[in-house]
UniProtKB/Swiss-Prot annotation:
Forms a 10-stranded antiparallel beta-barrel structure able to accommodate a hydrophobic ligand in its interior. In fact, this fold hosts the heme group, which is located in a wide surface cleft. The keyword Protein biosynthesis does not apply. It comes from the Bacteria. It comes from Frankia alni (strain DSM 45986 / CECT 9034 / ACN14a). Belongs to the nitrobindin family. GO terms for molecular function: isomerase activity; metal ion binding. The keyword Metal-binding applies. CDD domains: lipocalin_heme-bd-THAP4-like. This is Peroxynitrite isomerase. Its EC number is 5.99.-.-. It catalyses: peroxynitrite = nitrate. Heme b binds at residue 137.
Length: 147
């Protein structure tokens, strides 16, 4: 489910791919598409967003793990998140956010990922943008599909 203070709630579909190639980071690609009735010029299946990047897990000072996530978006934003891994939960907060002159005025994003009952991946993304306070923006529960 998606939405924001100035965006009517909407449903979307998503595919996330994590890929390992032997280096100390997982490649990451996410594609989302409109999954609601036609609205605001959007039709079911029309693309919404893509993000691509890498996830690196490093040993933490307290025996836990630190995760560093770099993401790039085609709408003019690049992000670096730093967070912690606790069991099957990953908490991420912005470390750096870079915007082009024409990108939306996003100033902060916080993400929570976790493996939930049945082995699904659930997440929530909160966003601070356009002068509005940090608030819920996206959340989903994804089922694992293997080739």
């Amino acid at each position: 489910m998606g939405g924001y203070e100035d965006i009517e709630g909407f449903h979307y579909g998503q595919e996330i791919t994590f890929a390992a190639d032997g280096r100390p980071a997982l490649g990451y690609v996410s594609h989302t598409w409109w999954a609601d009735e036609p609205r605001d010029g959007r039709e079911p299946g029309s693309p919404l967003a893509t993000e691509t990047g890498f996830w690196r897990v490093q040993p933490g000072e307290d025996g836990g793990s630190v995760v560093e996530v770099t993401l790039a978006h085609p709408f003019g934003i690049a992000e670096i998140y730093v967070g912690t891994v606790t069991g099957t939960r990953v908490d991420l907060d912005h470390n750096v956010l870079i915007r082009t002159a024409t990108a939306r005025d996003v100033t902060r994003s916080v993400r929570l990922y976790g493996i939930v009952e049945g082995g699904d991946l659930a997440y929530a993304i909160d966003m601070e943008a356009e002068g509005k306070p940090l608030q819920s923006h996206l959340s989903a529960r994804l089922h694992r599909v293997t080739d």
